[in-house]
Amino acid sequence: MNQTTIIGIAGGSGSGKTTVTNAIMKNLEGHSVALLAQDYYYKDQSHLTFEERLETNYDHPFAFDNDLLIHNLKDLRNGKPVEVPTYDYSQHTRSKETIAFDPKDVIIVEGIFALENNTLRDMMDVKIYVDTDADLRILRRLTRDTKERGRTMESVINQYLNVVRPMHEQFIEPTKKHADIIIPEGGSNKVAIDIMTTKIQSLVSKK
């Protein structure tokens, strides 16, 4: 019997995915739980020049190595440890370093495109979409990128208008239809998070 419960958590940039993920992980104390962030799986671009890498659209599904993510998840589900890739954002390509990752009772796959790939979705026991108003998402992104990543407000707004918003509308928003539950208002929706956690606890206890 499959002993690993796989949870997918998707939603736009700044929607509150991480807050929801952390709340669920905290509520599942007593079980071994780990986060497998989709951001770990940006494609290796070492074959490209640095100038070519600078043009990478990280808000497009093609930026992710879903084949490797699916392969790692299959191994983890079968009780095998894996080496998870890491990404060097300063060089815009995969790092040589990896992270040792052991099988867990619950694995949470979190990322903007967590529900976009058919094969990946089929591996998930529970699929969650965190739905947050666009105005709030851009405000959160502005705060994060200017304070934590040293970017100017102008550059963040330009990226949002020219890349993030159109990619969200074209690729991310449509994945909402695949969710088992949609959590409005992101991490502030404690009731939805509690209901979701109860569902996950029930699934884990049956395995």
UniProtKB/Swiss-Prot annotation:
A Pfam family of this chain: PRK
Keywords, sorted A to Z: ATP-binding, Cytoplasm, Kinase, Nucleotide-binding, Transferase
Subcellular localization: Cytoplasm
Gene Ontology cellular component annotations, sorted alphabetically: cytoplasm
E.C. numbers: 2.7.1.48
GO annotation, biological process: CTP salvage; UMP salvage
Residues the record lists as binding ATP: G11, G12, S13, G14, S15, G16, K17, T18
InterPro entries named in the record: P-loop_NTPase, PRK/URK, Uridine_kinase, Uridine_kinase-like
Chemical reaction(s) catalysed: uridine + ATP = UMP + ADP + H(+); cytidine + ATP = CMP + ADP + H(+)
Entry GO MF terms: ATP binding; cytidine kinase activity; uridine kinase activity
Stored Gene3D superfamilies: P-loop containing nucleotide triphosphate hydrolases
Family: Belongs to the uridine kinase family.
Protein name in the entry: Uridine kinase
Lineage: Bacteria, Bacillati, Bacillota, Bacilli, Bacillales
Gene name linked to the record: udk
